[in-house]
Amino acid sequence: MTIKEELGQPQSHSIELDEVSKEAASTRAALTSNLSGRFDQYPTKKGDFAIDGYLLDYSSPKQGCWVDGITVYGDIYIGKQNWGTYTRPVFAYLQYVETISIPQNVTTTLSYQLTKGHTRSFETSVNAKYSVGANIDIVNVGSEISTGFTRSESWSTTQSFTDTTEMKGPGTFVIYQVVLVYAHNATSAGRQNANAFAYSKTQAVGSRVDLYYLSAITQRKRVIVPSSNAVTPLDWDTVQRNVLMENYNPGSNSGHFSFDWSAYNDPHRRY
């Protein structure tokens, strides 16, 4: 049964981070604090063309970028039931796949493993039963984003598959795959599921407590670059800390991104 939200803009209340998240975040702070400013300097891109053009530069790949897009509203299953949830894309980044060496001056076929669906790092960071229906993909359609997979594959559990590419040696090459990050506001889910995610925020709105968190899925897009052009990849902890914890305030629905609450009353943005 879906929990129906109480209409109205979020009001000013204190932001709560569950105790488990506080402890985990504090131990990682030293490792990620130097990236906080960098995240604020990443550009914002909208749609596949702009995102790909920025991230997938063979001569100079980029770590990540903010993503603009629409907000949609529908059910997401967390813990023991469905929750009415606002969802929008907020970030994209390159995930490290593999380093491969070609020792001779020959053209060879490289074989490597990519993934589809939610990322492994997201799945292992969730401490509750979690599932999303394929119809949530209207968020990508409306944001001019295509994953390269079917809707069901895109929002399912992680699956590996083999991809191949011809490359000429000699040389060492680094492979990255594109990850899309989404922000969610699961309305009324904060009391029951505050410990469901490694990083989350809760916000009181009237009698309900909303839960804010991030999820991540992969695109069927990769870039292979010489090791001399390699970029230090972001990890899921760093992304969550900097995108959600450092750059979004649920009390004012502001920061580096915001939700469009009007999706609740728009049949074209509900699933």
Swiss-Prot record:
PTM per Swiss-Prot/TrEMBL: Requires N-terminal cleavage to become fully active. The metalloprotease AprA can induce the rapid cleavage of pro-Monalysin into its active form. Can also be processed by trypsin.
InterPro entries named among the record's database cross-references: BB_PF
Domain of life: Bacteria
Pfam families assigned to the protein according to its UniProt record, in alphabetical order: BB_PF
Subcellular location: Secreted; Host cell membrane
Major location (coarse): secreted
Induction section of the entry: Is regulated by both the GacS/GacA two-component system and the Pvf regulator, two signaling systems that control P.entomophila pathogenicity.
GO CC, alphabetical: extracellular region; host cell plasma membrane; pore complex
Alphabetic keyword roster: Cytolysis, Hemolysis, Host cell membrane, Host membrane, Ion transport, Membrane, Porin, Secreted, Toxin, Transmembrane, Transmembrane beta strand, Transport, Virulence, Zymogen
Subunit structure and binding partners: Pro-Monalysin forms a stable donut-like 18-mer complex composed of two disk-shaped nonamers held together by N-terminal swapping of the pro-peptides. After proteolytic cleavage, the inactive 18-mer complex probably dissociates into two disk-shaped active nonamers in which the transmembrane segments are unmasked and ready to engage the conformational change leading to the pore formation into the target membrane. Multimerizes into circular-like structures and barrel-like aggregates.
Protein name, UniProt field: Monalysin
Organism of provenance: Pseudomonas entomophila (strain L48)
